[in-house]
Amino acid sequence: LCQAFQGHGLGRYLMEQAIANEGLFYRLLYLQRSLTAASSLDDMLMRFHRWARDLGLAGASLRLFPDRWRLGAPSNHTHLALSRQSFEPLRIQRLGQEQHYLGPLNGPELLVVLPEAKAVGSVAMSMLGSDADLGVVLFTSRDASHYQQGQGTQLLHEIALMLPELLARWIERV
């Protein structure tokens, strides 16, 4: 089949896709190994951020809905809390019925999800968990055109499914 379409570049396209998928698989495997080896939540969050930086991104962040995780005192995880009420307008506007959003956020939206972030051009944002109700994971780029609608989200999806189990080592679910 590939030979029949080689004149049209299908063979080359399929090979490029296979190579790209293999690269994504190994990146995810490395991330999972690294996060599993973390000795604390802070260590895990630092490893996650460093992994994103190694990919050339500005960073990676997690925000959790406090009605799904025990984030209040005496825990020192309150900085991860994201008010569902504050997030809902952004979710409706940017995600709609989707689990992922890739593209820019405006100033007020950034203040909701990344209040301490500086120079964010675009984000890859995904709802956490299989029911998309645990919080949000965000990857940031300084480049406004780095993340755009229509880009693949498979790696983002797998990370959003993997993180809740790892987080549950340090934060109790409600």
Predicted feature descriptions by range:
Residues 1-34:
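Signal-transmission linkers at sensory-effector interfaces
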Residues 69-100:
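Allosteric regulatory "coupling" segments in signal-transduction proteins
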Residues 98-122:
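Signal-transducing coupling segments at domain and membrane junctions
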Residues 121-129:
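Short hydrophobic beta-strand micro-motif common in sensory/regulatory domains
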Residues 128-143:
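Sensory-domain boundary capping and coupling elements
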Residues 141-157, 167-174:
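Regulatory loop-to-helix N-cap segments in sensory/regulatory domains
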